[in-house]
Amino acid sequence: IPEEFLELLPDSPRDEDLPPRQLPAWAEAKVIANPAHGDRVLDDLCTLFAALRMDMLEQLPRMSGIQTSYWQLLLILSKSLDLLDEHQQPKENARVFLGKPRSEALRWLAQSWANSHAFDELRMAPSLRCEGTWQHDTIAPRRKILEWLNALPNLTWFKVEDFVDDVFRQQADFLRSGADYNTWIISTSDASARLLHGFEHWRDVEGQYIRFLIAQVLVYLGMVRTGKLLNQSEDLVFQVLPEFSGLLSPDGSLELPEEDQSVLVGRDGKLEMTPLVPRIARYQLARFAEWRTLQADRYVFQLTPASLQAAGE
């Protein structure tokens, strides 16, 4: 890990940069928790790479039941981490990634994202539209939010808006500062295309950046879990998972099951796989078969004369 990245790790926070952590906590009994994403991103990236190779990207939302925005985020993440070439085809780096043990692969993914210049959460936030040629440092604001989240106790529920308010009070300029508030051309992505100039739109810009980072990126990487409060469904809550430090710390530990299961091959040519079939095997076999089922715990493919002929062309 590059030395400049070590600042965000659990054993070396800079106390003078950390705002006080006095957020109101919510009891487990008051929260309706969403399922944790866990390490599913590893399996979904395998699916994405196979779909790109077979020109099936547009079919993924329908086949998987997962919204298009999720697959687009994984696509952008893959490009940012140099896993895809200029034609959106998996590179050798992607094959190496698929061959890594699950714990090693997820740690590599989280650490590479955290130190990526190319991945830009601000330009990806769905409610924002960034225009113009202005540039900004993508790593510094991300690192700040990660540092502050790391200062929170694990497995404790907090409102996302309380965290946003705390950042606003303690270090509002973590993303924009000075003239940036007026020179960065940012508007809402809805039909109104409302310009968000000035510090008065901090919660519309910085707030949305934080919400997107917590509720989507960190959830998908298996580092944060979200939920809703009972009788207050409009209030999104989150908890930092133990995997947060396990993924980002060079000394962290992360135990994930080995991919040691076999492909079930039916007499009719049906191939069934669980997530514990080696990802590299599923990636390779998916090319030779028709895709039938994409579920979190089960993948089904069918070998047919047509699929075998197409794979050979």
Regions found by a protein language model. Give the residues of each.
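A short, conserved structural fragment
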Residues: I1, K79-Q89, V219-L230
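N-terminal membrane-targeting/anchoring modules of bacterial envelope and secretion proteins
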Residues: I1-I66, Q72-I76, P90-L109
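Extended alpha-helical interface modules used as scaffolds for assembling large macromolecular complexes
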Residues: A33-R40, P101-E313
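The feature marks the first
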Residues: M54-E58, T68-S69, S80, V265-G269, ...
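Extended, highly charged accessory segments
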Residues: W71-S80, E313
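Short alpha-helical "patches" and their helix-cap loops
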Residues: H87-V96, N231-D235
